Amino acid sequence: MRRAALWLWLCALALRLQPALPQIVAVNVPPEDQDGSGDDSDNFSGSGTGALPDTLSRQTPSTWKDVWLLTATPTAPEPTSSNTETAFTSVLPAGEKPEEGEPVLHVEAEPGFTARDKEKEVTTRPRETVQLPITQRASTVRVTTAQAAVTSHPHGGMQPGLHETSAPTAPGQPDHQPPRVEGGGTSVIKEVVEDGTANQLPAGEGSGEQDFTFETSGENTAVAAVEPGLRNQPPVDEGATGASQSLLDRKEVLGGVIAGGLVGLIFAVCLVAFMLYRMKKKDEGSYSLEEPKQANGGAYQKPTKQEEFYA
């Protein structure tokens, strides 16, 4: 009895999983026009009552199932050994809990390895950051023809109890050496250059030239020492003058310009001379209106009277 009830329950479950879909078949469907000659539709009866209604029929699928298809064969559990077992564990850092809605990472542990060992292999060493002390030095340079005053004072953000000393560096030492720090109070160093002397840098400072001075202050400003003789001269556009001078300096270009001018002058003189010649010939020429008559068999005879027309 119990076995029969089990079979009935399995049959009902199988029928519920496969819903019966009604199959709709159109009976009154006109055949397809293969030759394409039929222009009128065949859906009308021709009696004037309108289109014929379509007749639809539904076919329900059969509900009989073979019983022998639903037999279930029990299977024995597969033997498992302790060596081939795999443990699935979720690895989370200490003090953290998985939130709702977030996927949990499952790590498959192999024999002889743990999830912690894999984490150690993945993690990289943190980069070491070294903070270097940066001291800013503010300086003002005044360029004059007579004297130059250089004032160096400590920055407002420097530590109290320290003072800054400036000393010329050697040629082999870099330009941006840190200032020497000594104990004691703050002090201000002022240097005044005598009249008539130029503002020169010690050997090794700057960019290697004596005309430019590069200060290593916080703003990275560059101050150029201007010579007194070149201060009042207007700026010269080197791009415009350089192109014209380069063309005129070449002998081939200069010779071509001179030759072209001479040829043009000769051609103009010849044209004017030809025009004057034509005008002069028209003024001097004379043309007779009647031809002289020849007598005595065509012998030459001086005409007695001849009318002349002056053009």
Swiss-Prot record:
Keyword set, alphabetical order: Glycoprotein, Heparan sulfate, Membrane, Phosphoprotein, Proteoglycan, Secreted, Signal, Transmembrane, Transmembrane helix
Site (Cleavage): 243-244
Ranges that cross the membrane: 256-276
Residues with the Phosphoserine modification: 286
Signal peptide (UniProt feature, chain positions): 1-22
SMART domains on file: 4.1m
Post-translational modification: Shedding is enhanced by a number of factors such as heparanase, thrombin or EGF. Also by stress and wound healing. PMA-mediated shedding is inhibited by TIMP3.
Topology of this chain in the membrane: Single-pass type I membrane protein
Organism superkingdom: Eukaryota
Sites where a glycan is attached: 37, 43, 45, 47, 207, 217
Extracellular compartment spans: 23-255
Compositional bias segments (type: Acidic residues): 32-42
Side of membrane Cytoplasmic, spans: 277-311
Disordered: region residues: 29-59, 152-184, 285-311
Compartmental location: Membrane; Secreted; Secreted, Extracellular exosome
GO biological process: canonical Wnt signaling pathway; myoblast development; positive regulation of exosomal secretion; positive regulation of extracellular exosome assembly; receptor-mediated endocytosis; striated muscle cell development
Alphabetized Pfam families for the sequence: Syndecan (PF01034)
GO cellular component, one term: extracellular region
One of the record's GO molecular function terms: identical protein binding
InterPro entries associated with the record: Neurexin-like, Syndecan, Syndecan/Neurexin_dom, Syndecan_CS
Job description of the protein: Cell surface proteoglycan that contains both heparan sulfate and chondroitin sulfate and that links the cytoskeleton to the interstitial matrix. Regulates exosome biogenesis in concert with SDCBP and PDCD6IP. Able to induce its own expression in dental mesenchymal cells and also in the neighboring dental epithelial cells via an MSX1-mediated pathway.
Family, similarity comment: Belongs to the syndecan proteoglycan family.
Description of how the protein assembles with itself and partners: Interacts with CDCP1. Interacts (via C-terminus) with TIAM1 (via PDZ domain). Interacts with MDK.
The protein's name in its UniProt record: Syndecan-1
Species this chain originates from: Mus musculus (Mouse)
